[in-house]
Amino acid sequence: NPGVTTKVGEFSPVGPNATWPIRVTPGVNRAYIAKKNGYATDTLNPETNKLINCTAAAGMTVYRGTNFPKEWANRALVTESCVQLVKAVEIKDSGNGKLSGTHPYGKDEWLASTDERFRPVNAYNAPDGSVIIVDMYHGIIQHKTFVTSYLREQYLSRGLDGPAHGQGRLYRVRSTAGKLEAYQDLDKLTAPELVKLLSHANGWHRDTAQRVLVDRADVSATPLLEEVVAKSENPLARIHALWTLEGLGKLSASSIQPMLAAKNPKVVISGLWAASKLPQAELEKLSAIILKLEPATEEMTPYLARVLGPLATPAAWEKLTNLVVKSDKNPLVLGAAYSGLDHQELKFKEAAAGKFKNKDFLSQLDKGASDAPAKKTAGELLSGENAA
């Protein structure tokens, strides 16, 4: 909805922010901030002279490989380049759209170094199931604009301003207890072979197969993808296949319908989000099944709210009204509902008269209605001031 001016999101931390370096870390910016110097907090632990909380969390990845033990599935790896470590975070999905995290190693880190030039800046899942760590391997990590006089002295005192050693380093971290996947060049595979890889246990293979299919724009894969969407028992394969169809421009009501009938909430959520991208005529073909849906999880509610608005029928608006009333305090649901009501705000408000107490939501409906003559319809290419 081009008239949406609200910005909603979930920005709570996933897991602890604490760090456990294995060397003293005075070479971080604002390390001089300490209670002993009259500040309210400490940047470094006064007893160990080590950083207390992350200050330079950089590139991260979620482990989706096959080499590490099973308990590693969906653990996040976060690089901390200022204090020479890579943090592991155990992620839990509550099912209500929020993630939580714990530190699986207690007061130890998954990977840490005493070499002050070790600057991990990114992490990747590898084709063989291992993890690749990108190490900038450089003395100075701070941008010149933010090098304080304190930090400058730290760099100079230990010769960290000296020449870099090569062009950085790549580390492959693997489990000796697990096997490594054999490498294959996915660019040389046929469409049927790539579609089969959408069910692969290694997330790198799934992602890359999807990308190659879309890059090729090979629409001959469409029937195979539709079969995976409709019949596969692998939820991840169904989701990848659906979004491959989207990338090929082959989304349709018939391809999305099996997703909406799935038992797995994540599959249904993908189906709802894909449905919101359909042309109006195709979306209307899904009206009956969408109206029968009830959110199996709290996470599903915003996606259902988003797709009900464009249906623009009394039954759809009645269902949307009930969702909004039940989720009156959930900004994600309210934002999704309003986003789907492009050029329909006033009609929806009239249909649901007197049922809403949330004044912010009502004011957004009024604003959208007043802006309707001037704004583009969602889905049209925007230009000029509309593109801002």
Map each language-model feature to its residues:
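Long, ordered, helix-rich scaffold segments
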Residues: 134-136, 157-167, 173-388
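Beta-propeller domains with acidic blade repeats across secreted/periplasmic ectodomains
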Residues: 1-193, 204, 212-214
